[in-house]
Amino acid sequence: MKNNFLLSLAVFLAMPVYADKTPMPSDAPKSYEAECASCHMAFPPGLMNQKNWQSIMTGLSKHFGTDASIDAKLQTEITNWLIKNSAIKQKYSAMAPDNRMTKSAWFIKEHDELKADVWKRAGIKSAANCMACHKDAASGDFSERNLQVPAK
């Protein structure tokens, strides 16, 4: 009985450590990093749902104001992988308006204490620049223990 209590307590105490982790799947195709991370962070696919990823990947010719078109074979490979690994957690599974994570309910809730001018700091530049503040964002760790908001 005591062991069960201690085990339950340990699991409960560890929950906040894993609460903000959306790991990058180990089977990420090299094309995802090569194509997507050449302009921005290669976001863990679990941060958005299937419909968002499908919409993003079918609209690469107008990808947030840029033509990000890629070879059809690579597009299919990346799309299939993103959909396979898309959000399953309730927190991330709602549609992100305009396919922007930064407009999703979970993102707004997580960042509601930040003023609008924070995103304009030279060290951040954009709300989509996760790695500016979340030092382990590339591995899917968005926890506050690794958070460091640039002062400028």
Which ranges hold each PLM region?
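Positively charged n-region of N-terminal signal peptides that target proteins for export
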Residues: 1-4
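Sec-dependent N-terminal signal peptides
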Residues: 6-9
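Sequence context surrounding c-type heme c attachment/ligation sites in exported
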Residues: 20-80, 84-152
